[in-house]
């Protein structure tokens, strides 16, 4: 999905605020995904799924760190996330349908914590960004 200059501007404007709370917001998005789509728990057999567990926060930080990298490479998301795509496709074999589920929850979390900044243009830009990330992470499945 092509990100326009305007999309990139909106992403770069809000993402540092999100990144500053990476483990918390990433964990919150994961927790929401696990609660709304329980089938996604199958990849985490030893997790404590309670909202603020060390497992949720640690994996939330991993998600946030990957999104930070993608945000820092908006012109080359595929190159920047290639190894992560390999990991999810070949080693972890994560259901590619899970990435849009998490992307949706990330949008929800950003909207909750940044209601003034989450205007329609920012919503559109972040949605396109997360779709781009999801597309990269599922590209090796084909």
UniProtKB/Swiss-Prot annotation:
Taken from the record, one Pfam family name reads Globin
Superkingdom in the source lineage? Eukaryota
Give yes or no: UniProt keyword Iron.
yes
Q: What is the tissue specificity?
A: Red blood cells.
- Assigned GO CC terms: hemoglobin complex
What are the protein's UniProt keywords? Heme, Iron, Metal-binding, Oxygen transport, Transport
Tell whether Transmembrane helix is among the UniProt keywords: no
MF-aspect GO terms: heme binding; metal ion binding; oxygen binding; oxygen carrier activity
**Where does the chain cross the membrane?**
none
Which residues does heme b bind?
Answer: 59, 88
Query: What are the Globin domain coordinates in residue numbering?
Result: 2-142
Q: How does it assemble?
A: Heterotetramer of two alpha chains and two beta chains.
Q: What does this protein do?
A: Involved in oxygen transport from the lung to the various peripheral tissues.
Give the protein family.
Belongs to the globin family.
Specify the protein name.
Hemoglobin subunit alpha
Source taxonomy: Eukaryota, Metazoa, Chordata, Craniata, Vertebrata
Its gene name is hba-A
């Amino acid at each position: 999905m092509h990100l326009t200059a305007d999309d990139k501007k909106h992403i770069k404007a809000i993402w540092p605020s999100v990144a500053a709370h990476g483990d918390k917001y990433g964990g919150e998005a994961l927790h929401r995904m696990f609660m709304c789509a329980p089938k996604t728990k199958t990849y985490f057999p030893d997790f404590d799924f309670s909202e603020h567990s060390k497992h949720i926060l640690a994996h939330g930080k991993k998600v946030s760190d990957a999104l930070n990298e993608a945000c820092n490479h908006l012109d080359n998301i595929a190159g920047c996330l290639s190894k992560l795509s390999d990991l999810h496709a070949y080693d972890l074999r994560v259901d590619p349908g899970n990435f849009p589920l998490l992307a949706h929850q990330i949008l929800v979390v950003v909207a909750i914590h940044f209601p003034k900044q989450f205007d329609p243009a920012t919503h559109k830009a972040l949605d396109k960004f997360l779709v781009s990330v999801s597309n990269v992470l599922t590209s090796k499945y084909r």
